[in-house]
Amino acid sequence: MFSKLIRLFISVSFMICGSYSMAQQTISLAGEWNFAIDRQNEGISQKWFEKKLKDSVHLPGSMLQNHKGDKVSLQTKWTASIYDSSWYFSPRLAKFRSPDNLMFPFLLTPALHYVGVAWYQKEIIIPKSWQNSRINLFLERCHTGTTVWIDDQLIGTENSLVAPHEYDLSKVAAGKHMITIRIDNSLDVINVGQDSHSVTDHTQGNWNGIIGRMELQSVTKHFLDNIQLYPDIDSKIVTIKIPLHEKRSEIKQISLSAKSFNSPVQQNIPLQTITHPAIVNDTIVIQYSMGKNPLLWSEFHPALYNMHIQIKWNDGQQQQQSIRFGMRSFKVMGQQFSINGYTTFLRGTLENCVFPLTGYPPMDESEWERILRICKSYGLNHVRFHSYCPPKAAFEAADIVGIYLQPEGPSWANHSTSLGDGKPVDQYIFDETNRMEKYYGNHPSYCMLAYGNEPRGRHQVDYLTKFIHYWENKDARRVYTGASVAMSWPIVPDNQYMIKSGARGLTWNHQPESNSDYSKAINAFKVPYIAHELGQWCAFPDFKEISQYTGLYKAKNFEMFRDILSEQGMGNEAERFLMASGKLQVLCYKNEIEKSLRTPMNGGFQMLSLNDYAGQGTALVGVLNAFWNEKGYVNAKEFSRFCNSTVPLLKTKSFVYTNQQTFNGEVEMYHYSETDIKNANIYWRIKNKDGKIVKDGVFDKDILAGKNTFVGNIHFDLSSISSAQQLKIEVGIQGTNYNNDWNIWVFPTKLPHIDTSKIYYTTKLDTKTEVVLNSGGKVFLNVAGEVVKGNEIAQTFSPVFWNTSWFKMRPPHTLGFVINPDDAAFADFPTSYHSDMQWWQIINKSQVMHLEDFPLSFRPLVQPIDTWFLSRRLASVFEAKVGKGKIIVSSLHIPTDTTSINPAGRQLLYSLEKYMLSNQFNPKSSIDISLIKGLLTEPSKYIFSSYSNGSPDELKPKSQITK
């Protein structure tokens, strides 16, 4: 009885449909539905729409939410590319393949999985009062293709991943009916690419179902939809275009009025009534004045309006709609973008459709507002939706928050399809992006559009050129590019802006500095250049995060990585690995983002990404986790110091100096706001480790908006520094929260003399080494370049890129290192517990030692953090008791001559040798010398194999991308 009352309940409400709302009657279809799985795809031939389906589910929702589907197994055919097959074949991973407890390393794991056809069925009642109305079936987001029957009559088919599925039921008689919906989430009809974030199991999951609003709607039979508003901030006019479906003579009057919101300033724009509107190409065109001082929408002032439209027909029917819009202009201006005439710089992140609790994107505005406000708190003003388009709630939230969006067609036409070769996906992209314009085109946050991500196809350039021309001629409210691509993809010359990977990365094969920029990459083009997928620096998994997976997807990958770490005797090191690798990750993002900010005429960047990516082998590239929560090693306040609308920048040739040098730094101010900062006082100060200011100064400067401004030079003679120490340089604008800082290290050219005659320093494990140890002596064994066990493990100063599974163990393999800075061994070497710039020359491309034969409890002094897929026990420096003696073994770049250009390396050697001469040199672990010999003579027992010949595009020859 209760369900019947629900079905009969009719409410007068405001329906938000894309960018507009209309007064109407609705009947909610949420609730219990009959259900059946059609594994053999026989439902149409057997006329299931004429039968009552026996199972049941609750909608809105997915099959997974309703516990429907097949148990995940080794035979599960994921909608995803997997290039690392080691999990399926490696004997050491056999226990993770147990049918009772499968732990996939490649992606988050659902309990059930299903790709194919499923049927949904519900009894409905159409009121008699609706008979003279247009009746619409509205399904906000379906996954993927739907076919609808009312009783035994086929109504139609829809296939959209970006927009509501709507069906006209106006010819259906009043009374009781059975609605049957067939949903197919396979890629058989239209293959957008199995790794597209709109469908892939790497991200949201390839779900089957309907989410969001589900309802029957009754509106006037003359109802006019797809009303689009085109603001012109120069003329202060909004052009309203209303496509006609009925003859003009039937329209009696159109009334318009606008009211502002989301702004401290309130405006009510006067009513305008039109009785004879202009008609151009079967479209009513109305010019509506916004008054003398309309409020403009931007990241700084996201003022919005509701345009109330009332259409009256001669037969007495009327239509009322309230359309949200903003007065804004987002354009290309030379090599940069402009917002309302002001130069802007896009500081963006990808949003990859990772929602572990539900397995699909949120349909409520509040959750999207939470996510976008987090993005903004980290200094970002832009979001790219990788190969998918979010629901309307995301656009509404971005309107409120002030974020520039780049949704994309729902395709990564690669890895199972191609673009421009005549496949169904070619027309589908045009259809889908037109649907995006219809439902979301009025949102001011919708500023940019691309077909999707990194396509394959011999004719992709021709196709994307046509795509750009089509859209730039059709709708000038936003700007267009063909595709978001890396460097190996062919150039589309007619792009209004470029998204390429040339303006990203750190050149840390050479000494780190902060003078260089990406000018060479961006100056190759006359249009704005956005760095494609900047970052991708990994941190170690946060196993505390496992408890947050309380929904439909479980972090079995994290559980597997945790077990592997524990098997290696390092389970108690997980938190240290997370924090140390996280600090290195932030250091990389800081330096790469600052390099982007100091590039003149740069268009911006798109990080990959602010939060973690759940799939493709588990890409822990975010400073936030998959839930957009902090991991503990950086927060928004810290991150936004170097990523914001205004950022102090410091140019210098190095971060490591000797006390015979002078520190020279150039201060400039990145400032992309709407106003200049006149008579700014820019302070700088240099502090020692105790926080004492050793040098400071102030610059007085006008900071101009929309560019970088040179502020002044800092010079500091370092001769007064007699001992190795870390200094901090701070630069900020007085009276504001805009400040930034950098660490530099100063090492003495002349070190205090210590008598090292009691230490046998050697680069070979020779006979004398054993003699010294057996007689109770001390040995420093420098095995740099001589390591065999671990030679296959590549260490650089930079951490793992994306992850080693997706890229088939492409180097580097480590995530920085962890040490105890309070250990006496480092008493004379300034360091924290993690990698920092003073370690670059010491650690970069140095060998690691694989301690696979050492006791599980053995802990080195300098411990590289291995890729979490293997968690091998590694060392760069370790100490031990051997025989009657004691030894330190190092594989780092440590020079012995006093004239070396590696002052940090000399200082580290000094600190270690001084430690060896002290009473504190008392290693906890005793080992046999054979273990050390094994490091130099025996290869690792375990060598990784991917058991696969396939590879991602980045590992393929360029010629294969255009096939």
Show the residue positions of the predicted features.
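Secreted/periplasmic carbohydrate-active enzymes, especially glycoside hydrolases
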Residues: 1-15, 21-385, 447-448, 464, ...
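Substrate-binding/catalytic cleft of secreted carbohydrate-active enzymes
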Residues: 382-624
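Ligand-binding grooves and catalytic loops that recognize ribose/phosphate and carbohydrate rings
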Residues: 417-440, 446, 781-834
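Short alpha-beta junction capping motif
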Residues: 757-803, 884, 912, 963
